[in-house]
Amino acid sequence: PTGSGVVGLSMAGSSALILAAYHPDQFVYSGSLSALLDPSQGMGPSLIGLAMGDAGGYKASDMWGPKDDPAWARNDPMLQVGKLVANNTRIWVYCGNGKPSDLGGDNLPAKFLEGFVRTSNMKFQAAYNAAGGHNAVWN
């Protein structure tokens, strides 16, 4: 199939961008909702480990190996932003601000992670624009 779109929430949001970066003929559109868009950098591996542990005792190293494994960089949208720009992939990136709402309640880990994720989304937007990107919507 060609010309499809892929959208993901949280960890699947960064995966949606990665799928579009590496398979531009199949995915011409990609959407990311509240995803950490620089997972291999800084606190990324630790925060992913925290979230995965909180979600059921999973380990981040079971996903892409130890944090210095090349798989982390390969699956990092920030490091693949040039591919998205070169492919002219249409992207939509959304992220909340970490403030509690009726939907999310007052969940402290969620508020912390959403605030951290928002910072990564803003860095991704800056990198995308600096790379010459012009086919994105940011919310």
Curated annotation (Swiss-Prot):
EC number(s) recorded for this UniProt protein: 2.3.1.122, 2.3.1.20
Substrates-to-products reaction catalysed: an acyl-CoA + a 1,2-diacyl-sn-glycerol = a triacyl-sn-glycerol + CoA; 2 alpha,alpha'-trehalose 6-mycolate = alpha,alpha'-trehalose 6,6'-bismycolate + alpha,alpha-trehalose
Annotated binding of substrate, by residue: S10, D38, F116, V117, R118, T119, K123
Record carries keyword Cytoplasm: yes
Keywords: Acyltransferase, Cell wall, Cytoplasm, Secreted, Transferase
Entry annotated with the keyword Secreted: yes
Top class in the EC scheme: transferase
Pfam families in UniProt: Esterase (PF00756)
GO molecular function, one term: trehalose O-mycolyltransferase activity
Taxonomic superkingdom: Bacteria
Major place of residence: secreted
Active site: S10, E114
Alphabetized Gene3D superfamilies for the sequence: alpha/beta hydrolase
InterPro entries reported for this sequence: AB_hydrolase_fold (IPR029058), Esterase-like (IPR000801)
GO CC list: cytoplasm; extracellular region
Subcellular location: Secreted, Cell wall; Cytoplasm
Described purpose of this protein according to its UniProt entry: The antigen 85 proteins (FbpA, FbpB, FbpC) are responsible for the high affinity of mycobacteria for fibronectin, a large adhesive glycoprotein, which facilitates the attachment of M.tuberculosis to murine alveolar macrophages (AMs). They also help to maintain the integrity of the cell wall by catalyzing the transfer of mycolic acids to cell wall arabinogalactan, and through the synthesis of alpha,alpha-trehalose dimycolate (TDM, cord factor).
Subunit composition and interactions: Homodimer.
UniProt similarity note: Belongs to the mycobacterial A85 antigen family.
Protein name: Diacylglycerol acyltransferase/mycolyltransferase Ag85A
Organism of provenance: Mycobacterium marinum
